[in-house]
Amino acid sequence: MTKTILLIDDEPDVTYTIKTILEDNGFKVDSFNDPILAFNYYKVNFYDLVILDIKMPKMDGFELYTKIREKDPKVKICFLTAIAMFNEEFRKIRLVLGKTINEDYFIQKPVEMEDLLKKLTSIINI
C-alpha cells in the first residue's frame, strides 16, 4: 500500500526537491509552502507521516505541530531544521511540548536524499 506524506516547508525549492524524490520512491506526497493552507487542507486519518519545517512565516512548525496533534493525535510527525539550529530547536521543542521527543523525528537540512528515505521509512514503520 502506498504511504501518504504531508510535506510543509516555506521554501519552494525544498518542497519540490523532497516531494520529487519521495514520489520517485513510491510515496504519495501533498506539499505546501504555507502552513496555514496546509492546516486548512489537513485530512484526519489520511496521512502516514507529516514533515514540518520549523522556521516558517505565519505559523511556525511548533504551533502547526500542536494544531495537527489536536486534530489527529495519532499521526506521525517529524521536523525539518537547519544543522546550525538543530540543538537549540531540539531543546526548544522538548520544552514547548512538555515531553521527550526522540531525536529520530528530526531531519537536519540540508539532507542527503538517501538518508531522508531511510529515516522516513523507519519513522513510518515504527
Where are the predicted features?
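Active-site residues of response regulator receiver
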Residues: D9, D53, T81
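Two-component/phosphorelay signaling modules centered on CheY-like receiver
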Residues: P12-D30
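Alpha4 helix (beta4-alpha4-beta5 surface) of REC/receiver domains from two-component response regulators
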Residues: E63, A84-I107, E114, K118
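Short amphipathic alpha-helix used as the core "switch/output" element in two-component signaling
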Residues: N40, F62-P73, L95
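Acidic, metal-coordinating helix/loop segments flanking the phosphotransfer/catalytic sites
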Residues: S31-L49
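Acidic catalytic/metal-coordinating carboxylates
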Residues: N33-D34, D60-L64
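Receiver (REC) domain active-site loop signature in two-component systems and cognate sites
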Residues: M56
